[in-house]
Amino acid sequence: MPAKEIKYDMQAREKIMKGVDTLANAVKVTLGPKGRNVAIAKSWGAPQVTKDGVTVAKEIELEDKFENMGAQMVKEVASKTSDKAGDGTTTATVLAQAIYREGSKLVVSGMNPMSLKRGIDKGVALVVDELKKRSKTISDKKEIAQIGTISANNDATIGNIISEAMEKVGKDGVITVEEAKGMETELEIVEGMQFDRGYVSPYFVTDAEKMEVRLDDPYILLHEKKISAMKDMVPLLEQIAKTGKPLLLVAEDIEGEALATLVVNKMRGTLKCVAVKAPGFGDRRKAMLQDIAVLTGGNLISEDVGIKLENVTLQDLGTCKKVTVDKDNTTIVDGAGNRADIEGRVKQIRAEIEETKSDYDREKLQERLAKIVGGVAVIRVGAATEIEMKEKKARVEDALHATRAAVEEGIVPGGGVAFIRSIGALADAKLPDEEQQGLNIVRRALEEPLRQIAANAGCEGSIVVEKVKESNGTHGFDAETEQYVDMLKAGIIDPTKVARFALQNAASVASLLLTTEAMIAEKPKKKEPPMPAMPSDMGDYD
């Protein structure tokens, strides 16, 4: 086991502070509408230029192991806030730096870190309650666009596209972000339920030009096992052929005699049909088939519930308005399922989302929910160069997260104003002396986001903070125009969830660092001196 180096007390705190400052100073220049860019060198190709705080934070790794510990802890603040709320990473970093800086001064002067921590925690709880009280719920398309615009670094195009996407697919709908082929950023809406399985044979195609199958008002047969023998299906196919309606068959696999018979019937014009493999795998496949059954008002043909293929009647089949199938995807539009059954299924999936501990399972459940509830929107991000494309795509993803957060918990005035207004919630708190000092740390730190936004805009932070304190309500400083305006009317708003997570995560990590009394790291290995060079003339060997 390699030897360790240990630093205590003052030495440890100095190293932590240096690491925190190194990372925070690189990140906080990106804050606000007039935040600066940060260029990040890559091992190959052009440097990455970004204004995204968490991207900058993730790139920072310090040579000194002790300083790096401080930097990594603050990096955790940024990435946690990004994961949970989608935005507010730079704000969280600024708050963490401010809380730790003020707190470490008091610890050095002899105060108990645990008492300070208790004061900080109580202060944060009071501010979070105040933020919730000041929060304003949103559903208006214009407000959603404003949130998207601010989170995308004041790009109104992105804000409007996100707003339109959320209007079309609802707040539970799936909105994905992809790279476009051209320079324009555009929105594509996929209505109905879409899953990533196409036709099993191109002979089913009805539109040869687009290579896709279109069925209007079809019957939908859902089977959880493979279908290879035809004899079990013949009675059902005869009944469907008599009605003159087309058929969509979804099963684990369709092969052999069954597939050949369906293709022959389609080509002869006896039965317009298409066979598709079921989406997903294992238990997830069964759940997705059940989703389709509920959506279309049919039954899943499964031996688990005692339904066999030979006994299936037209009443067991689902129906919908339209089905479109290409080689990769199947889209079911306007399923004829019972409204109450669909709502019951939605509640069940929501309950599973709440209970699951796995991020992967949660993501898959949310996809299923979105497919039943609304549809899928795809934002295709266009740009002139590869570097711009990556930067813009990251901004769109951030803005999308923040917009969802705003719809979920509401909004507060942006530009650091919500934090300034929340300072009043700390005025009446009476705590023991050292805990009161912890509360004062939070009071001072709450000014820091506005101070930094003003500094990045080239203004004097302290003057701006005092002017905003003198005003009231939603009035604050618009760094873009350098005017004092009503933030809500000007569209400068933050999701409450983002402000809340930024403060909670910053206080959590800063408190942890304040109560750190010792640091342990591996000693750097001493470099061995190189071997001496061989003599150039070794003489002659006889």
Swiss-Prot record:
It catalyses: ATP + H2O + a folded polypeptide = ADP + phosphate + an unfolded polypeptide. Keywords: ATP-binding, Chaperone, Cytoplasm, Isomerase, Nucleotide-binding. ATP binds at T30, L31, G32, P33, K51, D87, G88, T89, T90, T91, G415, D494. GO terms for cellular component: cytoplasm. The keyword Cell inner membrane does not apply. Its EC number is 5.6.1.7. Residues 523-542 are annotated as: Disordered. GO terms for molecular function: ATP binding; ATP-dependent protein folding chaperone; isomerase activity; unfolded protein binding. It comes from the Bacteria. Together with its co-chaperonin GroES, plays an essential role in assisting protein folding. The GroEL-GroES system forms a nano-cage that allows encapsulation of the non-native substrate proteins and provides a physical environment optimized to promote and accelerate protein folding. PANTHER family: 60 KDA HEAT SHOCK PROTEIN, MITOCHONDRIAL (PTHR45633). Belongs to the chaperonin (HSP60) family. This is Chaperonin GroEL 3. It comes from Syntrophus aciditrophicus (strain SB). The gene is groEL3.
